[in-house]
């Protein structure tokens, strides 16, 4: 029986594994026949409707937590409104009480809410390939793991036989080829699962074979031994030896790209290839339209399937790769320049080890995690480093009714908790849920990063910004603070300090709040904007060298409306309570950030959301950041345009529903058939309330609140709808907690700032 475990492990940890979540199969646990039937039914239901509803609802976790929390939760009678005219405080309060009561049963004793943070389909194949080439596949993944992974891959195969970049996307060569390879490595036959693999293979071959897989796929297939390294564009490790003052030094890249291409350059420099087995030999025949030994690998370097191509290579980039491939690489293989290659490899592996140890072998993200692991195995298969990598794989795996997947992080723990606290505090029910807030507050207090790095080295030696005082997206073991995570957690700490300690626990030490403020101030760029993890270190023109055809805007850490707005709001809250600490610097920071937000507003009044879908998300942040700096509907044309934009997108139903295609195409796109989405609706409702819509015409707010109330399920939960997170323009990701958090937050604000004010 599968069980979800929390805060356990023998591995090193900064806070006794607080926030850790992983699934484990226990053969000694025997579920009842009723439990088996429930699990079977939810899994079978997902399979039946897999082409209509691509997103799982985290029902396996919900079943377990419901059982762990004892008897059925008693809820008030559900409210359903026939129209907004029936709206009342009682209806809103009943819905909120039902929602928070249900959501509180999903909270762990550690204070966080576990959940699915998957969605991209290129992550799991990388893990399967990485474990295969290190000869650890069957050791690390039990037959139960492998069975659930196969189920996940088949559940997300599109009707045309391929797999998308993410669960809602159209089929791509990258994920079709990698998923096909993964299923073969997981034991499936060539025509397995009633011809599903045969259909996938036909999809690949009909498009010219796997030679047109994008660059990340070329690397993984080369590592596996079913694609030649000569068919890759160069990733020379020597680039890490360049002077840092050069704009194209990799230390100036966005950290996620930097930490992925660091170990990739090691594997490229070593020309690493895993063991050649009969399955590898067979795959060399299955994936291509020509005999393997006759493929023109040099020509294949520049091939990319049209289904995958989001950011085409520039001519400058292709000229650069051609020059390095034809001139640089042959020279670097010969003495004495071969010594330079070895020096570069030594430099890179040293940085890999620093990242591993600094993050307790979690690494920044799932791609770098697996590539780092392969590098450590190549260096020494019996090393402690490889063993410690293996022990952290389960942190990235998540099980739901659609199968076992690899997440985009090892969870979104801190991020979800920070929003959940703000949502509950926004309601008029705080006193009823003090124990929930206390546990969540403790989690926030114990999740702050309290060090600047591993050991006594200067973080800049490893191309890192200071981290002390920040908060990460997940847990402090990750050790990568994020600007908006730090801002949101700071806001929570300030909010909790204003509430009775008997209800929510003791406030954070003021010195720790100072550390957070210091970090936020240090992250502001010269133009006033805030990026995600670090300062922006290079220039936008570097994007012309973006080698990842499947993503956009990955070369530098750009400034975002979300991060900039969060910084403004939280610094204002801090300054209100602690006006003596760096007041002038905070005021200047807020003013510059507000000016930046105004400069990046779109002509139609919206803001592009880079981390949520999409214009409703970005516009919510844009509005609340400007309001925090004193802008109002009356004195700000920017706010008036933003308000008009949101109102223009409201659907006849009263809600908002935005497709992931908005982010992909950079044009606002409704969901199919005019469907509303509870999270988009919540963001829009929050934004309009913040912009003072209630004082002008509350009717759109009543309509939106009606949609949210009528969307609530019988048990107090809210339905999982289309995927709502995004990154790098083209790929979506799950924020499974949003379906609970944001309806609570929006209805809470609506009750207190619209209905009660009308009275």
Swiss-Prot record:
Q: Its Enzyme Commission number?
A: 5.4.99.-
- One family name in Pfam for this protein: SQHop_cyclase_N
**Which chain regions cross the lipid bilayer?**
none
Q: Which UniProt keywords apply?
A: Isomerase, Repeat
Q: Which domain of life is it from?
A: Eukaryota
Q: Which PROSITE patterns match?
A: TERPENE_SYNTHASES
Q: Which GO terms describe its biological process?
A: triterpenoid biosynthetic process
Instruction: Enumerate the PFTB repeat regions by residue range.
Output: 146-187, 437-483, 513-554, 590-630, 639-680
Which GO MF terms are attached to this record?
oxidosqualene cyclase activity
Q: What class of enzyme is it?
A: isomerase
Cite the active-site annotation: 484
Q: Name one cellular component (GO) term.
A: lipid droplet
InterPro entries named in the record: SQ_cyclase_C, SQ_cyclase_N, Squalene_cyclase, Terpene_synthase_CS, Terpenoid_cyclase/PrenylTrfase
State the signal peptide span: none
Query: Which family is this protein grouped under?
Result: Belongs to the terpene cyclase/mutase family.
Q: What is this protein called?
A: Probable oxidosqualene cyclase
- Please name the source species: Cucurbita pepo
